[in-house]
Amino acid sequence: MGKDQELLEAARTGNVALVEKLLSGRKGGILGGGSGPLPLSNLLSIWRGPNVNCTDSSGYTALHHAALNGHKDIVLKLLQYEASTNVADNKGYFPIHLAAWKGDVEIVKILIHHGPSHSRVNEQNNENETALHCAAQYGHSEVVAVLLEELTDPTIRNSKLETPLDLAALYGRLRVVKMIISAHPNLMSCNTRKHTPLHLAARNGHKAVVQVLLEAGMDVSCQTEKGSALHEAALFGKVDVVRVLLETGIDANIKDSLGRTVLDILKEHPSQKSLQIATLLQEYLEGVGRSTVLEEPVQEDATQETHISSPVESPSQKTKSETVTGELSKLLDEIKLCQEKDYSFEDLCHTISDHYLDNLSKISEEELGKNGSQSVRTSSTINLSPGEVEEEDDDENTCGPSGLWEALTPCNGCRNLGFPMLAQESYPKKRNYTMEIVPSASLDTFPSENENFLCDLMDTAVTKKPCSLEIARAPSPRTDNASEVAVTTPGTSNHRNSSTGPTPDCSPPSPDTALKNIVKVIRPQPKQRTSIVSSLDFHRMNHNQEYFEINTSTGCTSFTASPPASPPTSSVGTTEVKNEGTNHTDDLSRQDDNDPPKEYDPGQFAGLLHGSSPACESPENPFHLYGKREQCEKGQDEVSLANSPLPFKQSPIENNSEPLVKKIKPKVVSRTIFHKKSNQLENHTIVGTRSTRSGSRNGDQWVMNAGGFVERACTLGRIRSLPKALIDMHLSKSVSKSDSDLIAYPSNEKTSRVNWSESSTAEHSSKGNSERTPSFTSEWEEIDKIMSSIDVGINNELKEMNGETTRPRCPVQTVGQWLESIGLPQYENHLMANGFDNVQFMGSNVMEDQDLLEIGILNSGHRQRILQAIQLLPKMRPIGHDGYHPTSVAEWLDSIELGDYTKAFLINGYTSMDLLKKIWEVELINVLKINLIGHRKRILASLGDRLHDDPPQKPPRSITLREPSGNHTPPQLSPSLSQSTYTTGGSLDVPHIIMQGDARRRRNENYFDDIPRSKLERQMAQTGDWGEPSITLRPPNEATASTPVQYWQHHPEKLIFQSCDYKAFYLGSMLIKELRGTESTQDACAKMRANCQKSTEQMKKVPTIILSVSYKGVKFIDATNKNIIAEHEIRNISCAAQDPEDLSTFAYITKDLKSNHHYCHVFTAFDVNLAYEIILTLGQAFEVAYQLALQARKGGHSSTLPESFENKPSKPIPKPRVSIRKSVDLLHASHTGQEPSERHTEEALRKF
């Protein structure tokens, strides 16, 4: 790479030594002092050194990279060498924007004060945002304080008309809101018609921010086109904010721009929240100061409870309901009526404007812990550093770069709609979730007439949106019962109030850096998804209850009846799911609401193991148990199903995903406790039970995932899939014959065959079991057959697995965790940025000491420690070592987790594994453009000992194709230089290696099927319109020995009757004073590239042209207006070659007959393949013209000769001095005289 690129990479990775080395030549003449003349060596180093303000493709300078990645020392070093702080990237971001976005207060101070270049604090990006916007949005209060001290203008609005105060209020940055209000209280009155800080805070439920704004003097009744802040809070279900606004004295009769009051809004969105808000408005209008229907303060216990008083059971509330206004009564009735109907998630979303959806992303505190009949609490399973957790007040939460996973939510608009049963599951698919359902004992819910429609509405919502919704809260119809859902999400910070603000809707400014950071965060997470929280149907009944327990920790399932723990009117139903000893998820399933309620004897456990729907794939949850507890006969106290595996039936697989196989850890404890009424049917869903068996080999466990996945999770090592035969067998056996989701449990006379371990399982009887009905008998026979088939296949595979050679495996961990374990966490960026981003592919056969040195780890002691730790990592096993032979390139790349390169391999002709086994590293660099050394080493290690052709030898220096002489003899190739002149010892010839690889790819029989050609040419080739070629062409390797290619690109008639058109960038032309063949093209390419790289303005001026190649020559066509600019006849083209430094750049030399000068024209193609095809097509055009000349002369029809081959005296061009890769030397004789087609060639090109 060039020095500019080295400087950018060093600044990004934090390599201070390399930055100092690259910029050291400037010292002394720029800032080093001294008034004497500069030494010549210093002048030369300045000339050759990198540009300190050079940019990459995204417009980032080295200072951008250093500021974004927090490299303080490099920022100081760059400023010392006069790096400019006021250069914007392609999106208009200045370095101070990135430092403020990152929250690095030290770098912000350096950029402002250090100099010699000082940042201007009010600079705006393309979105009109200042650095204060970035800091305020992400809650970086220290940076905000610095910027306010530097007199940053807080009244500047971005393209969405948002001030920094608006952003801080929108995202709940309480501390920032207080700071800005304190510094500029006049902002309270600077509002637009679209929004105010109060509206934005109310919309997202930031209660504390709303209170601060009101205390600071903001008008509570200020209005926008959306109405008052009460409209916003009511629309999004923010009950706490509604209460605060009402207590402050807001006018509830204000109308929005559409003439709607708050009550009208609630009518349009019937939900549990709407019911609560309507009741609150009722009390407010009646003069009640404090609500009795909202939740009580959070208990000190870890479980947050919601208390809702029942208006029916409370005499005082009965009195109030009788005196309610007619409008409110009508509203409440309409809400209840609408809830009985099928209201889907889409119906609710369609009424919300796009502006709201763009700004909402995270679950607010009402959704997480304070409102509704259930609460959700978020806790962290990953220890975050202190810098990643910002200690804020009630509504504060960390966002921005320290929590990059938050920015990955696929939808920022649907997370927080304020409706009680809907919250989008929008976390990345590689995250773990642990759901815990704990119904509380002392919660009062709404009256009995509300019981059924709440559950029906919840089931309808789940059914209509299974793929993107997570049922976060299920309202409980029981008067003495309610549920609570606890969500554990890795990667989230643990706050006191468990609330999270919405994720900002702007992506990180740096695409390259953000991608690397995101990969670093996501990569270590297991590949699994979450399921959907099932609905819990608790019916309000005053009957005795019995409690049953399912214990699966020892491989058995038992139901034990026990006396009720409390009187029937206040008895507690607790459903609890816990995971002990494992990090896997117990997913929660839902019961299909199309199942008709049926009654069965209690001995027939009505449970069925279903596959999760394709919309909520849950690879880690093997079983979903749907339980329906029936009326129990008197005197029946215990149902025991110990050591009897639960039956399961596989749902038809509706997706095409290939099943995987994993093992899970042993000793997984799942415990489910539920209560049972003695004389009333109740529906429960038993959630997250994982069946485990004792006695399996090596303590491993095979689990069938019901969504079409057989998975195997192990404590050590990588996940590998089972043979395809086993998977095919599993798929073929996955059938479902019953339309019902209920199935009877097998009787005690039937031996269960669901035995996943080698030891047999004892049969246990079930008291009171009745005979199975005939309809279930046939189903169980089918299930027994399925279990037998799967059991045989799994046991056979276990034997094969146990027969393999065992070896140490490393725990699945990130590169950062691995470096932390060896005490060198500072090198994480070095490894990640250079492709060493997966511990599973960093064994001793992948990483070497030289690699560590190249990526900037200069400390020899640290390198030695890393190399010692690498010895403990597993070596990469080459393909074929353990019987694994990938059948396709895509499969092989996926196996080494480099699937992103699949397209690059295929479009460059590497379409089979046989071709890959002969690939060289230089091809990975120059052809495939794989710049990360870690990825290259991983690829080569995976390929193992590859089959190369014979050691490449350098080709002859030049081959001259001459025109026929006067005696009409065929042209002769010039004598080749002796091969003994070039030895293969010491180094390989890189150009020839690449040409060999290209020849291998083009020998592939299907290669030409993939070659992009013109539409007309493809049609004519398919229909045979070309017919047999009228002339016979010599293959390229016979026409010139400088290329080993054996096939031309096009049909000869294509170049005779039509032309081959290619689009490219024209970099310019250079006068050739001394014609030296490919050396001249090489010099011209280097000069033209250097001119274009000097400035971005120069690059913007590079025109796009179309090269139209035929046997007559090359036409320059303006790609914009399709005008012909100039023509170069084939006889005047001397040499065509690719640039060895950049294979996408090529050039050819032509002679201007008017001035008798030679010019080299330089182009850049869109990719390497296109450049090579253009060069080869030029060679084919000459061959076609030459063969036509031969045919004409043999037939004596001199008049039909192409004008390029009329008999004229000729003299050969001197041989080029060096060889060049993939070049076609079209060295012709020069002719005197001027043809009409050449009269304005060079003049037109120079003007162009």
From Swiss-Prot:
* Residue stretches making up the PID domain: 1056-1213
Repeat is among the record's keywords: yes
Q: Pfam family example for this protein?
A: Ank_2
Any idea which residues bear Phosphotyrosine here? 901, 1007
Ranges where the record places region Disordered: 296-322, 367-400, 474-514, 558-623, 749-777, 944-989, 1197-1248
Bias category Polar residues: which stretches?
305-322, 371-384, 753-763
Domain called SAM: residue spans: 810-876, 884-949
According to UniProt, the name of this protein is Ankyrin repeat and sterile alpha motif domain-containing protein 1B
